[in-house]
Amino acid sequence: MFEDIKLIAFDLDGTLLDSVPDLARAVDLAMQDMGYPRVTLEQASHWIGNGADVLVSRALSQNYIVKDDLDAELIKQARARLDQHYHDGGHQLSHLYPDVKDTLERLHQQGYTLALVTNKPSQFVPELLEQHQLTHLFSEVIGGDTFAEKKPNPFALNWLLDKHGLTAPQMLMVGDSKNDIQAAQAAGCHSFALTYGYNHGEPISDSQPDVVSDEFKYLLAVLSMAR
């Protein structure tokens, strides 16, 4: 299935990096600033994945389903507070999942082109990659505000295909949420899903990715078997 893969696109939060503790802290402090109910780690783990504006909207709504009458200015204020607290926290609570760095380095050495496609605001991504010594591994880094559309829209994946002159079967999307899998399916490329991330409380297998794994390093085995 994966014998033609040339380019591998990775999600960040919940795939490479466990960032929920820092995000939960930041959104909780933002809600406290604004006099709204506090946000728990468990709530935050179900609410992230669709970008920062959606995260604060869910926190303001205290629900995964955002209130229809939520004021745009209120969302803007909450987003500004979230960004400030997230920046001030220095990402000290976040950590790479097991075998991520070694696996990425081996894929890079094997000649695969690696790209990062995340819904996280772009301003925070370079610092995180540098902090975990991953910057040199990615040919492209696409944040949630790089283009007008973010995952599950396939725009970023289609852009990568066009830039590298590849067809859809030559690209693999690696992620932990239905946003990643739906983007891959819409672009026509292959998908590799991880069970340990953040998928809004739903089994990632429900999204019907090509491969489901509990371990990031299994990606090496799958690609090796395809060669």
From Swiss-Prot:
It is an enzyme of class 3 (hydrolase). Its EC number is 3.1.3.18. GO terms for cellular component: cytosol. InterPro entries: HAD-like_hydrolase_sf, HAD-like_sf, HAD-SF_hydro_IA, HAD-SF_hydro_IIIA, HAD_2, HAD_sf, PGP-like_dom2, PGPase_prok. Pfam families: HAD_2. Its cofactor is Mg(2+). Mg(2+) binds at residues 11, 13, 176. Keywords: Carbohydrate metabolism, Hydrolase, Magnesium, Metal-binding. Specifically catalyzes the dephosphorylation of 2-phosphoglycolate. Is involved in the dissimilation of the intracellular 2-phosphoglycolate formed during the DNA repair of 3'-phosphoglycolate ends, a major class of DNA lesions induced by oxidative stress. This is Phosphoglycolate phosphatase. It comes from Aliivibrio fischeri (strain ATCC 700601 / ES114) (Vibrio fischeri).
